[in-house]
Amino acid sequence: MGKTITAVNIKKLWYGDTSKITAKLTGVLLFNLLKTATEVKNVHGETWTLEEAEANKTVYKNQLTGKVYRSDKEMGEVKMNFTIGEYDYATKADLLGGTATDTTWERAKGKVSIEKFLVGLTEDDQYIVIPRADIAAREATTDKAVGLPIVGTEIEPTNEQVAAEYWFDASVVKSA
């Protein structure tokens, strides 16, 4: 039997450009990927979560027997959520869109579509990786400061070799 995990709380969090993931992830590839990623230095309070919605299931009954003879299932969405409590303008532009300099940020016009990979490292050393997440970010006042609540919804990678989600024990995330 493998190592028992709880995947409790968040210890580190990163995001980055989805084009950096070009093959099925391994611990070695993740180790190298993190070198290109942006680390989120502040997650406000206890806002980090990983949630999977319940699947929608439809059952079909045999009219003659009244018993289920087949079913159909649509899997629920997987989302990584967190609020950044302290950030710079570049981070705001990365996740909310728009243009940034060291001292200014300007909101983009129209609809903004942002995709990033997301990686969370839990307190019990489990890496959770979403290779392609649709990022929905906004401004929200939380505890008297304007934070950036982020919802990263897992979407199907464009590369068939890449899974929609990976988990790695930290013991395998190392250089070759």
Model-inferred region functions:
Residues 103-139:
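Acidic, glycine-rich flexible loop segments
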Residues 84-107:
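Charged, amphipathic alpha-helical segments
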Residues 20-40, 98-105, 160-168, 174-175:
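Short secondary-structure boundary segments
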Residues 124-176:
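Mixed-charge, glycine-accented linear interaction segment located at domain edges/termini
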Residues 79-83, 117-119, 149-151:
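Beta-strand secondary-structure signal
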Residues 50, 71, 102-103, 157:
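Basic, gly/Ser/Thr/Pro-rich low-complexity segments located predominantly at protein N termini
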Residues 53-55, 85-89, 123-125, 155-158:
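Generic structural motif
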Residues 2-87, 131-145:
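Solvent-exposed edge beta-strands and adjacent loop segments
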